[in-house]
Amino acid sequence: MAEITAALVKELREKTDAPMMECKKALTEAEGDLARAEEILRVKLGNKASKAAARVTAEGLIGLYISADAKQGAVIEVNCETDFVAKNDDFVAFVNKLAELVTTQKPADVAALSALPLGEGTVETTRTALVGKIGENISVRRFERIETANALASYVHGGKIGVLVEYAGAEEVGKDLAMHIAATKPRALNADGVPAADIAAERSVAEQKAAESGKPAEIVAKMVEGSVQKFLKEVTLLSQPFVKNDKQTVEQMLKEKSASINKFVLFVVGEGIEKKTSDFAAEVAAAAAGRA
């Protein structure tokens, strides 16, 4: 059997774009025969779209759509691998069409959306064709749809931050709320909506800091509670200073305008996705270690 060298693994990886360890396994199975290893990988990984699916999609675009009567709307995140593709006209059109489909067809989840008719096929076949055309993995990550008797407003910042707001009041209020949310990124409408885990984490940090002060227990308790309340004011929409007038909170602004907000959705591209950084030397070392 031919020796499975790092150079051979590198060559196969460049030919197939498969992960380093998959290349090593294929070469081992093929006993060092590069052509056979390539065929093994193609069977394993399928066509170009399947092959691309192994790659991390941390870039992308936020799509938004609101019906003409502003009663129905949707926000969607579709990911790709690079910011360059996120600006591709075909990719942008695909994302915007999906936002419209979510609004009008009301799919329950991403799987249901993928099965919807689009063009001469489905959303999924269109996505697969786009992967083949562009050469990058594309994945529909998430969406949220709102239908209301009140009104909807939206704001997209650079295609990377998208906000959908359900509110009651003047149209200007809806626009202001959407822009404020994009700028400040609140976690919830009010304190009741902040995840308990987030509050617990903040309390833990505050307790550690307060304990280091050396103050009496009752003072420490007040310091901790003060820190938690400060945190809640910073991350809840209604308690935040309004971006267009920081002398009043968002709640005060709404009261002044005789308006209200029922719900908001905030999507940030790639939020929570760990971006993969390529270190070929490290991958070669890992492959070599696995061979030893």
From Swiss-Prot:
Pfam families assigned to the protein according to its UniProt record, in alphabetical order: EF_TS
Recorded GO CC terms: cytoplasm
TM region(s), chain numbering: none
Compartments, record wording: Cytoplasm
InterPro entries in alphabetical order: EF-Ts_dimer_sf, Transl_elong_EFTs/EF1B, Transl_elong_EFTs/EF1B_dimer, Transl_elong_Ts_CS, UBA-like_sf
Keyword list, A-Z: Cytoplasm, Elongation factor, Protein biosynthesis
Broad class of where this protein is predominantly found: cytoplasm
Molecular function in Gene Ontology: translation elongation factor activity
Source organism superkingdom: Bacteria
Region annotated Involved in Mg(2+) ion dislocation from EF-Tu, chain positions: 82-85
Function according to Swiss-Prot or TrEMBL: Associates with the EF-Tu.GDP complex and induces the exchange of GDP to GTP. It remains bound to the aminoacyl-tRNA.EF-Tu.GTP complex up to the GTP hydrolysis stage on the ribosome.
Protein name (database record): Elongation factor Ts
Organism: Bordetella petrii (strain ATCC BAA-461 / DSM 12804 / CCUG 43448)
